[in-house]
Amino acid sequence: MAEYKIECEQFLGISHSGGVYANGESTVELTDEEVTTLVQLIRQKGTTDVDKIDLETTHPQLYAKLDKAYHDMARHAEYMHWLWEGYDNGYYEYDDDELMEYCERECGFFFEYDENDYLDANGDFDEEEMGYAKSKAFHEWLDDYLRGLSDDDVVKFMGEHMDAAVDVDDVEYTVSIPEDIIQKAKEQA
């Protein structure tokens, strides 16, 4: 068994700035026999088009394996796209102070300040101004923190602490033959 890289680019619609796409990348695990079958079909039919080589009919289990891998990859790519879209556009409603406190306790957020930087015209400490600065620093930190997490950890964090939820039902995708297998077919020709 070997893993083969697969990729997708999905058109999700049009926004005011043009087309919206989600890109995905994953792997599919195939046996040597399955790889040989794909290579032979490509060489016999002279095409890499899954429909034209009639893979779904002639080798339904192999097709089902590729179909599942492409479906799961496409679904994940679309899910992550909309999850980040919601975050970037402020769609999720959560208690800012509660999240900040959690991140101070559990995630390493720390706001260090000098009281002299937050004095009002009378020389008194301006707690409100310091609060704004802390909130701004937190959101910058949070953005960096989230973008540094794995997809699974982002999904978990946003779901548990930001009430983020995305519904991805019907995913459009195309089943293809992994590029490395296509290259093998060309090399052996």
Could you say what each language-model-derived stretch is?
Residues 1-31, 183-189:
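Short, extreme N-terminal segment that most often corresponds to the first beta-strand
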Residues 9, 39, 43, 60, ...:
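Intrinsically disordered, low-complexity regions enriched in polar/acidic and amide residues
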Residues 14-177:
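Acidic, low-complexity, intrinsically disordered interaction modules
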